[in-house]
């Protein structure tokens, strides 16, 4: 009984194993037949004689995600959300240039009238180039070129030095009294003067004498003692003769500035440590690429805007601030007849939007392929205008308050661009506020966030470009490339911590992010509009956002004709009005101007140099090399196959099997020769759609029409 039962069990197990072997053999045969079949894996054959297909799913690859739940590009990555992308782009465009250049241009170029050429240049030059860069980055999902890469490196090196200054100020603001609020420090000179309207009134009420250092001497015996013998009486504040304590603190204590460019001096190790902290923050923010950077902007960008608004409201409550706003924003319409004003407006538009620095291309390259970047450009442009106006209002209210305190007419106040405005004028106004250290901490936190929000994405531009150039070796080692680049840039930035560092920083800022960006914009616009084809580019935009940007003819004319002409006009304005530049009272020598021109022309020289290298590496006769040089690379287009299949289905292996004829003597599963009748009788499946919208029932691929190369690409 037990024997028969065990024998029956063995029989059933052997039958089961036999059936399993038959099923596995059948499955392997079916897989082999399916692999040799002409039908793609995402389609199911309905009838061999009438080849029609139904979709069983999207084309999927191990590096792609089509369910909108994760990253589309599993290798390169994408933004976690559209909010991350928009805040990052907003933080990138809200650079320090908006704060330290726009108010100055309004001051010298017609006050409120300057906003008119600024808006015009934004519309006809800034907006089109921003749209072009966002579209290029999102379409190709790759990094930038060599010329833009070099400019990005220079900007990143010296801009992080400004962040180091802000960190130095931040740490020294954690005191009960701000060190730049008085003239009693060891770094102050005889010309340092403190003038406070309330202190003067109190001193006069007590029949006292106000000294340069801001102290009031009531007793005449005290006035003639040894401590006050070297101090003169301050009867009024003369801007040309007296120096604000914030200016001496910045030049003598923070920078330890020398008297000329070639007097390097020693390294200020306090600044070197602050610079190291700035680069460590950049490394931590970009440790996980755009994933971590996208989260940092939630704090950095939003906090910067909140602090900017809070400081503006606080300064607006002070006496004289409203007079400053009225004075500086009062339009002087005759300035619009000066072409220099229009050139300055165009330069400021490029500087404010951070165009042609590569950051916008990199930010857009991490977006999803079908993100509506047409909506993004309007959001960024409106935010840029509002931010510029708010930054100008902050500066003008501070200047009005300072002029009231110093009893100086507003039109006599010497407003200067650059570090003078950010690290001298505004800190001087903040030092006169009640509980000044709290506002100083807020202000320098804002400056640090503004600078790092820009430099971290410039840094990501550099790192991603290097990784995209060598994807097999470096893309999986993004952090190593980031660490090495941060260390290299820190080493290159240490010379800016010397006594002559401010002179070199001003030189780099004067020559790098100005007219070279306009030249890059010109070549970029010409290459896209005239070489690649503006119609092709607009088709690519439609491919991504599923409609042509309205109005179609406007963008076509802008990119093809207006933008190149505007860029050439801007260059002529800038170059014709060029004069040797200065910092404070120091005039740069001729050799320094030559060095600046060399630094500015080096990235521009990379454009013809790289073209020459490409031409020499090409094969064939001269006309063929020239043609190949002007044609896109074979891998140009969307990075993911799922997106290429939307417009060029024959480029994708699975889609190619769907549309191209199968090899000769191919049999279906029922043994019928699907190639019976020859290639001339082969028609596309009725549901297979080509890039021009025609279906298989409407087009026939002839052997005479497709060359062997065309059978492989079929574009």
Which positions does each model-derived feature cover?
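Membrane-interface "cap" regions at the ends of multi-pass membrane proteins
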Residues: 2-100, 129-134, 192, 201-204, ...
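Membrane-embedded translocation segments of transport machinery
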Residues: 43-79, 86, 290, 294-459, ...
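Transmembrane helix-boundary motif of multi-pass solute transporters/channels
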Residues: 84-120, 131-132, 281, 286-292, ...
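Hydrophobic, membrane-embedded alpha-helices of multi-pass small-molecule transporters
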Residues: 87-97, 155, 212, 225, ...
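Transmembrane helix-loop boundary segments of multi-pass membrane transporters
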Residues: 103-121, 137-141, 148, 291-300, ...
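Hydrophobic alpha-helical segments and their helix-loop junctions in multi-pass secondary transporters
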Residues: 129, 160-164, 168-177, 305-328, ...
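Extracellular/lumenal N-termini and interhelical loops of multi-pass eukaryotic membrane proteins
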Residues: 163-263, 321-334, 405-428, 520-522, ...
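A generic transmembrane alpha-helix motif of multi-pass inner-membrane proteins
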Residues: 494-496, 506-529, 551-668, 715
């Amino acid at each position: 009984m037990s024997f028969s039962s065990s024998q029956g069990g063995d029989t059933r197990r052997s039958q089961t194993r036999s059936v399993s072997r038959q099923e596995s053999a059948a499955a392997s045969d079916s897989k082999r037949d399916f692999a040799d079949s002409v039908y793609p894996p995402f389609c199911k054959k309905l009838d061999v004689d009438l080849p029609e297909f139904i979709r069983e799913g999207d084309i999927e690859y191990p590096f792609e995600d089509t369910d909108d739940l994760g990253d589309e590009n599993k290798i390169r990555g994408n933004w976690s959300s559209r909010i991350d992308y928009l805040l990052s782009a907003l933080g990138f465009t809200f650079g320090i240039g908006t704060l330290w250049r726009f108010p100055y241009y309004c001051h010298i170029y017609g006050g409120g009238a300057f906003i008119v050429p600024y808006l015009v240049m934004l519309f006809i030059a800034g907006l089109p180039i921003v749209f072009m860069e966002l579209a290029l980055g999102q379409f190709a999902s790759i990094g930038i070129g060599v010329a833009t890469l070099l400019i990005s490196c220079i900007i990143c090196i010296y801009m992080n030095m400004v962040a180091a200054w802000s960190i130095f100020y931040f740490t020294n603001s954690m005191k009960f009294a701000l060190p730049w609020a008085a003239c009693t420090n060891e770094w102050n000179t005889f010309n340092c003067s403190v003038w406070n309207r309330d202190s003067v009134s109190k001193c006069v009420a007590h029949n006292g004498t106000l000294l340069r250092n801001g102290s009031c001497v009531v007793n005449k015996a005290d006035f003639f003692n040894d401590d006050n013998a070297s101090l003169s009486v301050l009867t009024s504040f003369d801007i040309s003769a007296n120096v604000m304590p914030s200016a001496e603190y910045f030049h003598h204590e923070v920078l330890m500035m020398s008297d000329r460019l070639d007097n390097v001096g020693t390294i200020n190790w306090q600044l070197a440590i602050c610079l190291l902290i700035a680069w460590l923050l950049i490394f931590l923010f970009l440790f996980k690429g755009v994933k971590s950077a996208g989260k940092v902007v939630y704090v950095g960008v939003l906090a910067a805007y909140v602090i900017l608004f809070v400081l503006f409201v606080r300064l607006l409550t002070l006496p004289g601030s409203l007079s400053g706003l009225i004075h500086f924003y009062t339009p002087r319409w005759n300035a619009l007849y000066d072409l220099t004003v229009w050139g300055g407006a165009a330069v400021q538009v490029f500087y404010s939007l951070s165009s042609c620095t590569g950051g916008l291309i990199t930010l857009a390259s991490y977006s999803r392929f079908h993100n509506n970047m047409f909506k993004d450009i309007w959001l960024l442009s409106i935010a840029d205008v509002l931010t510029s106006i708010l930054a100008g209002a902050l500066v003008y209210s501070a200047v009005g308050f300072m002029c009231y305190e110093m009893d100086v007419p507003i039109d006599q106040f010497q407003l200067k661009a650059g570090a003078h405005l950010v690290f001298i004028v505004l800190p001087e106004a903040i030092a006169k506020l009640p509980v000044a250290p709290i506002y100083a901490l807020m202000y320098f936190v804002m400056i640090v966030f503004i600078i790092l929000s820009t430099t971290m994405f410039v840094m990501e531009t550099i790192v991603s470009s290097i990784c995209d150039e060598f994807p097999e070796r470096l893309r999986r080692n993004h952090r190593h490339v980031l660490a090495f680049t941060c260390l290299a840039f820190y080493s290159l930035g240490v010379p800016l911590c010397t006594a002559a560092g401010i002179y070199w920083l001003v030189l780099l800022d004067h020559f790098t992010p100005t007219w070279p960006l306009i030249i890059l914009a010109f070549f970029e616009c010409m290459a896209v509009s005239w070489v690649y084809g503006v119609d092709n580019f607009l088709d690519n935009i439609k491919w991504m956002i599923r409609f042509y940007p309205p109005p179609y003819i406007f963008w076509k004319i802008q990119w093809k004709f207006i933008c190149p002409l505007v860029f050439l006009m801007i260059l002529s304005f800038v170059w014709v009005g060029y004069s040797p530049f200065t910092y404070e009272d120091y005039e740069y020598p001729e050799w320094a101007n030559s060095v600046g021109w060399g630094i500015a022309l080096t990235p521009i020289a990379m454009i013809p140099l790289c073209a020459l290298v490409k031409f020499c590496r090409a094969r064939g006769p001269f006309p063929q090399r020239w043609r190949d040089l002007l044609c896109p690379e074979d891998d140009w287009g969307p990075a993911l196959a799922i997106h290429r299949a939307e417009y060029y289905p024959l480029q994708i292996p699975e889609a190619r099997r769907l549309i191209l004829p199968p090899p000769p003597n191919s049999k279906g599963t029922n043994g019928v020769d699907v190639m019976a009748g020859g290639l001339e009788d082969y028609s596309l499946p009725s549901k297979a759609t080509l890039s021009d919208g025609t279906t298989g029932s409407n087009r026939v691929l002839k052997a005479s029409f497709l060359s062997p190369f065309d059978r492989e690409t079929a574009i």
